[in-house]
């Protein structure tokens, strides 16, 4: 969308530019006018939007970005919500930090560490979606979980994705993992422990958790046996110091954390049994082993049983990325497997864009276990039935090249790509990503396939010790890219994406497109109000920033989880199971029904988060918040979730 912002109407044909006499979409809009907030005073109507928070909660001297500040984070999603539910999407690994050095956005006293979100007003304050015209319609690895074990024999399958495995598992503030989107453990109770001796050191990036199993990209599926083994390994971690995987030759085998579990005991008193007690202790050892094996098998079987729909392995299944290509060749549009994937009548091209991260693209782990081109091709084949535009978050591990190759092999002449560059405090990482961006552009003859380059995602929380410093760093990188593009006659837009309320006049000036991440689920809004709330928030916080300019506005992330609990604007602290934003298939269906087709009719440009579940994110789930791995339209095997219905919008498709 460019030029004057357009109103979002819930009546068909009521699409028109907003004029000064037009009333706000919802009565709650007037709430903002009753509060005196900071005015940026920028020309061209670049005024800071008013927050619905009262001034009594503002923190002076923090540029309205302190704890519970006016406009802190997303007013409604809020900075505090962003800190407790940061929907991260890029290489969010604090590679140059140590265990005691928490970055600002995760520190306990960081700006916005509390939650300033005002609970949603009564239903009358929003237009209920009942009034809307609803349409019918990697590489896995087994991390050392404290005393967790090496994978059991046979569990080191290099072609299957595990619900508990990932090459880019994060550990709280130490390693949030590349391209992740998880809630932060505010209580500091991180689920994993890093063994520094097992960290792969490439000279600049650290804390990428190496794991015992590697999985290639033949499929996203995890066979029940492998899943059971993975679950058993996690539950029966005490066996790690005793059993070694027979598949160790296929990938690195990592034992439990030193000093923990049976391995530590084995090196201690068990290593030198007292005279006359050997047989008795051996008996106890055997008994313990058998008990743990049984418990591990039971728990592992339960985990395997929860995998749901799994992709059926073809006779030509292979174990590694190279093996996949050796057996199946370089998949293309004429491959039988691809033809099947591209012929799903339940998928409809109604999404303007999709957020996407190929599996196995963590640096430096991908240097040892390269991601699979064929797996990316399979993904793009499915994505092509949902959208014509794909967004990436980084350039590491040849992910951009693989997506471009997949588009070429599938002959998707209408498919476009938003390039992504990850920005954080690690200069080596940023420079590597930028150099890869330049290399991709140099090697691509026709730049018309690119819709733009997104420099950083929510970088204001990770590119500096403060938001002001991070913004300065981010803008400097954007300026560098702009200068490079101008020098080399590269004519594509340059943008960044961040939380909706983080945008200000300076950031708008530096970016060709205003890209805002807006998640109604984390605002604690009931699903029947979610579509209306999303539009209201975006309209009042982001569209206004481009008034008087020709800059486009895009919602860079929006979605709804299919399960895992409910959020009342302060995480899973809800009074009951039906309060706030409830995750579920029915709710996901309703949000899509209320939002997708009307946004398509209204010309709203957005990226849906996301196409596929990312099961490894289960490590970030907590007692009351179990949704991190459930944001996909499809399961990891590329199967549409049971009961989910993607609107067909009367046959209208996104362009």
From Swiss-Prot:
Topological type in the membrane: Single-pass type II membrane protein
Cross-referenced Gene3D superfamilies: Glycosidases
Active-site residues annotated for this sequence: 458, 557
UniProt keyword Lipoprotein, yes or no: no
Ranges that cross the membrane: 283-303
Biased composition (Basic and acidic residues): 89-98, 323-338
Signal peptide: none
EC annotation from Swiss-Prot or TrEMBL: 3.2.1.39
Residues carrying a glycan: 426, 576, 602
Subcellular compartments: Cell membrane
Reactions mediated catalytically: Hydrolysis of (1->3)-beta-D-glucosidic linkages in (1->3)-beta-D-glucans
GO molecular function: glucan endo-1,3-beta-D-glucosidase activity
Family named by the database record: Belongs to the glycosyl hydrolase 17 family.
Protein name in UniProt: Probable glucan endo-1,3-beta-glucosidase btgC
Species this chain originates from: Aspergillus terreus (strain NIH 2624 / FGSC A1156)
Underlying gene: btgC
